A protein has these predicted regions:
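A conserved regulatory-domain signal marking ACT and ACT-like small-molecule sensing domains
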Residues: 1-79
């Protein structure tokens, strides 16, 4: 996959509300999501979010997402 926009790869536990927690952090900073995907192998296991955005990605934002209890890994990709 080629990332043309600032992006996050977020590995997390598959639990209710995790997507909302991550997207709330983005919304609080005024970040617009231009592409989003989620994949998992089994219900309740681990999942991976791929989020492309229209700018606004920085280390402070990524650190807030990393601090969420269900997040296992958060990687920033800058074009």
């Amino acid at each position: 996959m080629l990332f043309r926009s600032p992006s996050l790869i977020v590995q997390h536990r598959d639990r209710p509300g995790v997507i909302a927690q991550v997207t709330d952090i983005l919304a609080d900073r005024g970040v617009n999501i231009c592409n989003f995907s989620l994949s998992r192998r089994q219900k309740g296991g681990e999942a991976v979010m791929t989020i492309e955005m229209d700018g606004g990605l920085d280390e402070i934002l990524a650190a807030r997402i990393r601090a969420l209890p269900a997040v296992l890994l958060c990687v920033m990709l800058l074009p």
